[in-house]
């Protein structure tokens, strides 16, 4: 968004997101890569995609965002909610758990001898912040468009996630 939307390059953003949409579709449907996006399997990639779409909604319009990316948002959120991601596990408290013991999975991705220098496993704060944001944004956007079933389910999950986030992560 910073390289496109921030300078009114909406068409370029949409072009990039079309490539991302294809890659995300292939990934979540376990289909051969029609388009290759580096590290698509990492736990935060789909959540960052939702954040990018949220920036589009802010800069362009929520209605246009829902029309253009509503189905993609639904697909991403259902994929994560149903625990289909190979390295994101939705726990009963609403938080996402990821395993980074064998492979670096966050921005702290330095490796030595093929293993993470800083293995990050468990409830990773930035992943869960993105998750909570994705739940709230998608719930609101879908509700505005009349998709209340999924919107309500995401909102209930967001309530649970928000409470667990505050209980789990120290904020001093």
Regions found by a protein language model. Give the residues of each.
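A generic structural motif
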Residues: 7-9, 123, 138, 145
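Amphipathic alpha-helical interaction segments
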Residues: 56, 115, 139-140
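Catalytic cores of carbohydrate-active enzymes
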Residues: 81-93, 97, 130-172
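Carboxylate-rich helix-loop segments that flank metal/cofactor sites and access channels
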Residues: 92-112
């Amino acid at each position: 968004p910073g390289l496109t939307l921030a300078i009114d390059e909406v068409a370029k953003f949409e072009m990039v997101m079309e490539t991302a949409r294809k890659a995300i579709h292939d990934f979540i449907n376990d289909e051969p890569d029609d388009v290759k996006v580096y590290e698509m399997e990492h736990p935060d990639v789909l959540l960052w995609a939702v954040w990018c779409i949220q920036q589009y909604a802010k800069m362009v319009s929520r209605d246009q965002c829902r029309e253009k990316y509503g189905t993609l948002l639904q697909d991403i959120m259902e994929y994560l909610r149903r625990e289909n991601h190979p390295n994101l596990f939705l726990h009963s408290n609403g938080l996402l758990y990821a395993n980074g013991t064998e492979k670096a999975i966050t921005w702290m991705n330095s490796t030595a001898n093929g293993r993470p220098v800083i293995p990050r496993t468990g409830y990773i704060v930035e992943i869960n912040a993105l998750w909570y944001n994705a739940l709230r944004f998608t719930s609101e956007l879908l509700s505005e468009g009349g998709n209340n079933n999924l919107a309500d389910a995401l909102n209930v999950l967001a309530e649970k996630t928000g409470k667990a986030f505050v209980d789990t992560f120290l904020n001093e």
